[in-house]
């Protein structure tokens, strides 16, 4: 819908024909009818104000009561002037006739006209919110208005136009279309002149509805400056004047672009600590830090140790190995498969629980918990004990701690690289000194012993050659420029013999033959290495063990009684790691003999169990130390976290069990080792085996 903006028009005058028709009618329009027409006009005025947009800057809403009061005041002034016979001195141009409407009312649609026409024909009246009755002005002679049905369409439009239009609205005068004040005053004067010729006094009612009160409270910047304080403020935030404005920066901006770098450059350290191997596994590419070149993803390979099963090695013949990773507990179980026949009272199926509880056939067994693998030496001796863990050898020097405390062993490649470096360093060519002319070598019989002094004297003699004998000296120098022929190396070889068989000791080479350089061995003797190889260290250590077994050493040990254990052995001196402590001495018997002895010991209530089972060269053996021989090895108590370990040493084709220090043992510490028996029957009768 297109809105057309119009200027304020003067109030239309009712035609003479209309006035005559009104006088000639049957009767004047009653006061109720006049009030109804006025109220209908005010109602349509409110509807027209409702359609006015409060967001327009040139829009202004006024109260209907004030506009109606203005019309009543105009009629009162005209009547007072007629009574006095004098025209009003005050110009009526300052007054406003009708209701001051907004610009939207000036550009109303045809719909408002039909609404006013329908209301006038039906004669509908509006009840105001004011309970006061309509006051009549007795001083004003009421003039009858023609009925709406008697008036034509043209006259009805004029009457409604007088009620709805106000050419002197301050809101309209403040709009941009009324910037010329002189023109506005002329239009207002013409309007009042027309109204004075034929006044139409109408009794108006002062009313105000609730909805109009809420709408009229809205005031804009234009209405507040021209209404003279007529508008009021409201608490409705939707009808208040906006106080915030948007200041949009309309300056043109530069075109932005996105740059993608091919590599990332780190300005500072990203990680507070060095990255670990696990962090390196989380990334599959390496980012260059120099910012140049393309970064290609490179896989990061991290070697992770995988647990390997324990293997049993076949017999070796080049050396032996010592178990360096012995644990405090033994999971090897029973080393030999012993079965108790039905004749045993403890193992018989028909025997009762009392027979079993009386004494087991095997109270407990001393099993080799972690026997150390021993490779046979050149004489054919040695042991291979299956079930033990694979070891990498022993170290005597600098390896005196337990496997948990021992330093990490260097790989063999390190020693090979060091040897290659030493070989390259020794095979480097000798630096050549500048050639210096020297005098012929004197006869061997007159050669002094101190060669340094002789060389210094030769240099001094060369500087003191007289100038007169220049020819002789030149010839002499030319002769010295030719180096003396070196003797063949074969003749100088140490230990070489002549035809007569006598050895020739090599003498020092002349300085001319060596170009003025001397051998390092002329000043320093040859230093021989005193370090021993790993094989030599092992052999020496085994010889010491054999010597200790043959001598039956038991030094630094003492027997003591312990609460709940009985007798035990403590150390009275310091023992180093892998040092010989004591031998487990007893009768070396086979498995069949051990089975018979177990049956016999089961019948004796006072007999203990001192039978040590172990395996040697894929054959099961047992050392029976039940008989008290006074040896201290049989008195060492059990502990799963013991400080001793067992090793098999072969001497004269006979295996011996020796106990070595697993860690450094301080004086006063009890000596213990793991018996290795984890059978249910043994744990049932001897619960202390679990500790």
From Swiss-Prot:
Q: What is this protein's record name?
A: Histone-lysine N-methyltransferase Set8
Write out the GO biological process terms: cell division; methylation; regulation of DNA damage response, signal transduction by p53 class mediator; regulation of transcription by RNA polymerase II
Which Enzyme Commission numbers does its entry carry?
A: 2.1.1.361
SMART domains to which the protein is assigned, alphabetical:
SET
Provide ranges: composition bias, Low complexity. Answer: 220-232, 484-503
Regions of compositional bias (Pro residues) in chain numbering: 431-446
Q: Name one GO cellular component term.
A: polytene chromosome
Write down a Pfam family by its short name: SET
Which residues participate in S-adenosyl-L-methionine binding? 565-567, 610, 637-638
Its recorded reaction(s) are: L-lysyl(20)-[histone H4] + S-adenosyl-L-methionine = N(6)-methyl-L-lysyl(20)-[histone H4] + S-adenosyl-L-homocysteine + H(+)
Q: What subcellular locations does the record give?
A: Nucleus; Chromosome
PROSITE patterns, from UniProt? SAM_MT43_PR_SET, SET
Question: Taxonomic lineage of this organism?
Answer: Eukaryota, Metazoa, Ecdysozoa, Arthropoda, Hexapoda
Q: What is the role of the protein in this entry?
A: Histone methyltransferase that specifically monomethylates 'Lys-20' of histone H4. H4 'Lys-20' monomethylation is enriched during mitosis and represents a specific tag for epigenetic transcriptional repression. Mainly functions in euchromatin regions, thereby playing a central role in the silencing of euchromatic genes. Required for cell proliferation, possibly by contributing to the maintenance of proper higher-order structure of DNA and chromosome condensation during mitosis.
